[in-house]
Amino acid sequence: MDENLVELSEDECLDLLGAHSVGRIAVVSDRQPLIFPVNYVLDGRTVAFRTDPGTKLTGATLGRVAFQIDSNDPLSWEGWSVLVKGIGTDITDARDARSKRIVSSLLVPWAGGAKEHWVAIASPVFTGRRIVHRPG
C-alpha cells in the first residue's frame, strides 16, 4: 500500500461516521449504478437514512448497497474516506428496538419532503483510509 495511505480501523470509521451527517448512498437501478447524497443517522453500527418511494428506495432495498463519506483539505493534501457496504433494508415498519429508535429520531431530510421511508444498512462492513501528506 502507498505510504501516504493509512487504513482506518472499524472504530475510527464509526467515529468519523458519528461526527458527520451527510454521505452518499450507491445503489443499482435498471442495471445502472446510481449515487445519491443523503443525510443520515448512525445508531451503533447501523447507518440509516430517510427517503421517498422511487428509484432510491427501490434500489436501496433490492440488495447490496454502498455508503460513503469523506473529507479532504486541498491545501494540505490530506483527507479521509469511509466506505460502508451491506444490505439495504426498509426498516420503516420494523418492530425491533434499534429500528424503532432510528425511525423515531429527529433526522430532518435536507432535501425536504415527507421522506416517510427509512432504509438501514444491514450486515455492514466498514473500511476506510486516511491520506497523510508526508513532505519530501
Regions found by a protein language model. Give the residues of each.
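Extreme N-terminal tail/first-helix region
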Residues: 1-18
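Short hydrophobic/aromatic-rich beta-strand segments that constitute the beta-sheet cores
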Residues: 49-51, 67, 128
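Short, surface-exposed beta-strand-loop junctions and turns on beta-sheet-rich folds
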Residues: 31, 55-57, 135
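Short, structured beta-strand-loop surface elements
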Residues: 53-117
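Beta-strand-connecting loop/turn residues
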Residues: 45-46, 63, 124
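Short beta-strand segments
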Residues: 20-52
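A structural signal for short, well-ordered beta-strand segments
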Residues: 40, 86-88, 123-125
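Short, active-site-adjacent segments that bind or coordinate small-molecule cofactors and metal centers
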Residues: 104-136
